[in-house]
Design a protein with these regions (language model features):
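C-terminal interaction surface of TIR/SEFIR-family domains
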Residues: 2-7, 11, 141-189
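Conserved TIR/SEFIR loop-to-helix hotspot centered on a Trp-containing motif
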Residues: 81-129, 149
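Short, glycine/charged-enriched secondary-structure capping and boundary segments
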Residues: 27-30, 88-91, 152-155
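A short helix->loop->beta-strand "cap" motif at the edges of active sites that frequently abuts
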Residues: 129-137
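Hydrophobic/aromatic beta-strand patches that form the interior of the parallel beta-sheet core
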Residues: 74, 136-140
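Conserved N-terminal substructure of TIR/SEFIR domains
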Residues: 1-73, 77-79, 181, 185-189
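Solvent-exposed loop/turn segments at secondary-structure junctions
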Residues: 19, 80-82, 144-146
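Short C-terminal domain-edge/linker segments immediately following a structured domain
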Residues: 43-47, 71-74, 104-110, 169-174
C-alpha cells in the first residue's frame, strides 16, 4: 500500500545494523508475529521497500516519509551500529570527490551531499520527533548489557534503553545467554 494513504502516526520504525544485528531484528519480528508472544507493533518497513538500485539520497527521502508515519522508533544497537557508513554520499556512485578545480564535494545528480549514514540520519530524525513529543524512542542492545557508548550519539541519553539478552544458569550450573523477551516487552510496551 502506498504511504500516501496514511495520515496518522500509527507505525513503529525499526532501525539497526541489518547485517551485523540481523538475528536480533529477526527475533523482534518473530516475537511480533508469534501467537504466544504479546509483543505487537506494525513495522513501517513492511508497508513499502526501497529498491536495491535506489540512490542513497532517494532512500533517505523514503525513510523520512516513513518516519513521519511512526509513533515509535526502535533501534537495535550492536557493536558496530554507531560506526556504520552505509548511506553516506561518499559511498554512492554519483558522488563527486573534491579536486583541485572543485574544493567542495558534490553530486553528479545535483543533489545535496549528506555524508550521514542511514542509521545516523534515522537517529537524528527520531531525536527531532522525540523532542517535539511526536515519537517515543526505544534503544535495544543486542547484548546482556546496556552500553550507551555503542548507541548513536543523538539517542545516547534519550528514550528507553534495554538489553535484549540475559545470562541464565541452567539446572547443572552452566551459564549461557538467551533472548530476554520480558526486557524487550517492557521497553517497547
Amino acid at each position: 500500500m502506498a504511504l500516501d494513504n496514511y495520515t496518522y502516526r500509527t507505525f513503529t520504525y525499526l532501525a539497526g545494523d541489518w547485517t551485523g544485528d540481523s538475528a536480533a531484528i529477526e527475533m523482534l519480528h518473530t516475537w511480533n508475529s508469534g501467537h504466544k508472544w504479546g509483543l505487537s507493533f506494525k513495522d513501517i518497513h513492511s508497508e513499502t521497500q526501497s529498491s536495491d538500485d535506489s540512490h542513497n539520497c532517494s532512500i533517505k527521502v523514503s525513510l523520512r516519509k516513513r518516519m513521519k508515519l511512526c509513533k515509535k522508533f526502535v533501534i537495535v544497537v550492536g557493536s558496530e551500529t554507531a560506526n556504520l557508513r552505509s548511506g553516506a554520499c561518499y559511498t554512492c556512485f554519483w558522488y563527486k570527490k573534491p579536486d583541485m578545480y572543485n574544493l567542495m564535494p558534490g553530486c553528479y545528480l545535483n543533489n545535496h551531499v549528506d555524508n550521514r549514514s542511514y542509521v545516523q540520519f534515522e537517529c537524528e530524525m527520531a531525536k527531532h520527533d522525540y523532542d517535539n513529543d511526536d515519537m517515543d524512542i526505544v534503544v535495544l542492545y543486542n547484548s546482556v548489557n546496556v552500553n550507551r557508548n555503542l548507541c548513536p550519539e543523538p539517542l545516547r541519553w534519550v528514550g528507553t534503553h534495554a538489553a535484549m539478552k540475559k545470562k541464565v544458569t541452567d539446572y547443572l550450573g552452566n551459564n549461557h545467554i538467551e533472548w530476554d523477551y520480558d526486557s524487550v516487552k517492557k521497553a517497547i510496551g
